[in-house]
Amino acid sequence: MTLHTLDELLADGVQGRYVLVRSDLNVPLSGAEDTNLTVTDDGRIRASLPVIEKLAAAGARVLVLAHLGRPKGAPEAKYSLRPAADRLAELASVPVSLAADTSGESAQKAAAELADGQVLVLENVRFDPRETSKDDAERAAFAAELAELAASGADKEAAYVDDAFGAVHRKHASVFDLALKLPSFHGDLVRTELDVLRKLTDSPERPYVVVLGGSKVSDKLAVIENLIGKADSILVGGGMLFTFLAAQGHEVGASLLESDQIDTVKDYLARAEAAGTSFVLPTDVVVASKFAADAAHELVAAQAIESSSFGAAGIGLDIGPETSQAFAEQISAAKTVFWNGPMGVFEFAAFASGTRAVAQALADSAAFSVVGGGDSAAAVRTLGFADNAFGHISTGGGASLEFLEGKELPGLTALDR
């Protein structure tokens, strides 16, 4: 795969040129009103900033494309990029403004008024249903409108930079189709993510330990299958652990269970044993009376969840201290660690201990460590860990997993030309 770099674009010169940058501004927000929201984790904004500033500093007229959340193809106040754009403007050393629309007359007017070295964030691309359309023609038409924005008063050829690694697994108009319409390059963030993930897939230093958590085992099946025979150990926590316990014949009470995946998990356990990959499952679990921050809870053996005072109504919400210690020892002995998915409901203080223990073990480890984006990145920041405590915190949750699954990523395919 041959991808053109940002340095190549800068060497070619961007003074006075429009450069459309697909950034990842899909950040968590909080607030009582849809119109009074603030960014609670600006990690992705900070990660997107260097490319935007490099281009603006070199005299480009930067048009930032991004999405936030999952709007249903129409404007919704709670999904506006306004909070993200405001935070970007606070952090940036160059002028940043927000357009009221993504395309159309008002967006064209705002783009035409952009001066060299200025940045315009276009409104959420997913406000247009064509962004995520399965119809190739619809997506291509929307991409053409986006490309047209770069022709607003400019006499130099526009360019496209994909710096949204968290979206490269999507065949969307601003990720795939737009890259086919303009000279295209990949940004520093995408390059860094690829370099890091290739260390995990090409020749990881061993022992190579993978820590998987999160709610559903079905979300991780493909990556688990691809890791069998490649990872030395796979540590399983989070809601997905209960399907593994059920596959071993244990009762799991009212814990999250994907019964339709039990046979698949049984198959993976057998294949892993034959391939020399060991699954390390919890030996103790924190079981609660209900899914709530203030729920009564007890520590029980993982193989006897229904032995708690809650009986079959008990819900497992975190791994226990014995498991946390065992996982920490595995991480301490590793040379390479990839972690994706929290160990429990970290948003509730009573059930955050397992996730905190894994994060601390990674922070203390001398191994090359990668925190796989999404909920894992949010968890370590929520629990007070600095980004530099880990080797790398990925901005791509789903994209990272699909890369490790060996899947083709449309956003990268479009750049390979």
Swiss-Prot record:
Signal peptide: none annotated. Keywords: ATP-binding, Cytoplasm, Glycolysis, Kinase, Nucleotide-binding, Transferase. One of its GO terms (biological process) is glycolytic process. GO terms for molecular function: ADP binding; ATP binding; phosphoglycerate kinase activity. Its EC number is 2.7.2.3. It comes from the Bacteria. GO terms for cellular component: cytosol. Pfam families: PGK. InterPro entries: Phosphoglycerate_kinase, Phosphoglycerate_kinase_N, Phosphoglycerate_kinase_sf. Pathway: Carbohydrate degradation; glycolysis; pyruvate from D-glyceraldehyde 3-phosphate: step 2/5. It catalyses: (2R)-3-phosphoglycerate + ATP = (2R)-3-phospho-glyceroyl phosphate + ADP. ATP binds at residues 220, 316, 347, 373-376. PANTHER family: PHOSPHOGLYCERATE KINASE (PTHR11406), PHOSPHOGLYCERATE KINASE 1, CHLOROPLASTIC-RELATED (PTHR11406:SF23). Belongs to the phosphoglycerate kinase family. This is Phosphoglycerate kinase. It comes from Renibacterium salmoninarum (strain ATCC 33209 / DSM 20767 / JCM 11484 / NBRC 15589 / NCIMB 2235).
